[in-house]
Amino acid sequence: MYDITKVRESFPILSRTVYGKPLIYLDNGATTQKPICVLDAMQEEYLNVNANVHRGVHWMSQQATDLHEAARETVRKFINARSTTEIVFTRGTTESLNLVVSSFVEGCMKEGDEVIVSTMEHHSNIVPWQLQEQRKGIVLKVIPMTDEGELLLEEYEKLFTERTKLVSVTQVSNVLGTINPVKEMIRIAHEHGVPVVVDGAQGVPHFAVDVQDLDCDFLAFSGHKVYGPTGVGVLYGKEKWLDRLPPYQGGGEMIERVSFEKTTFERPPLKFEAGTPDYIATHGLATALDYVTSLGMDNILAHEQDLTHYALQQLREIEGMHIYGHRNDSGDAVISFNVGDIHHMDLGTLLDQLGIAVRTGHHCAQPLMDRLGILGTVRASFGLYNTREEVDALVAGIKRIAMMF
């Protein structure tokens, strides 16, 4: 049974107050709070085993290296990759995507070649490609969507040409909560001989992701959105692709042999991990993944689905409420909305005065906002520790604020 009281006890920050009100944290799409086990694990390593990894023969370096590589194995198991050689540590989803963009363009694309993305992408899966448009002449093609926030797969299929080299698409919209049919999209792309990058930042924290079942070629996600520390993320890549792609950055650790005439590189994943990694953060990430695994990803999904459905039901009863996406209540634990003529920034600011933390703005998805014909929304995003009582407080707060306008 999912014991929400016990779960919340693992997160000390949830017991604090804001403006004299109990904190209600509904901004999990931006970052999640950290369980005490993650904080303890990172502190323990700093206190007792703080040494650089892969570089020393001394005991502490060996211990730190073992923890770092054990974290890689934990990630491998969590997403069901075939080998730890397919797990690259990065600073987060943004760097993971930039790594793929830079290395894939350099190694596999030329001027006039095409990449397909969707209307609902985060800026981190748009701007890097636009930089390559300017630098290398890469062509960016966009999958359209319906007014309800669902991708048009028949239009997606029409975008493929002989110049299409890559598809890069979000698993879950960070604005709409739409869960895209990425497995089907991958199948279609592979029929055209095209590999696929999946932005899993908003999927991996909420439900089980199996890269072998998806058959994706790359998957990116961040530690801080799955109850781990900031500054660490993951790029999964099929071994054949990581072997083929050139390095993203140069420096220590990623080399095999350096001379002034020539440098040879390590095999993946080290080839893509130049410099000292954040080995404390990788240990924290592994601890976070062990924590959510202990709760059960299916249990987390069921809990968050219950919250999301309950919130949708309650929010829809508010006069002037406009919810974006969530056709048939089939979305992830993210709800974006506006209320009447209240500016989203005003609504978010006033909710904050009630101790309720939500996100406001364009959510790093301005092209999606343009498609919706709006400047921004209020976004409530749920995590494994949120409750129905917190949803009730959100709804009551919105109703109270609406009476002021």
Place the predicted regions along the sequence by residue.
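Pyridoxal 5′-phosphate
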Residues: M1-F405
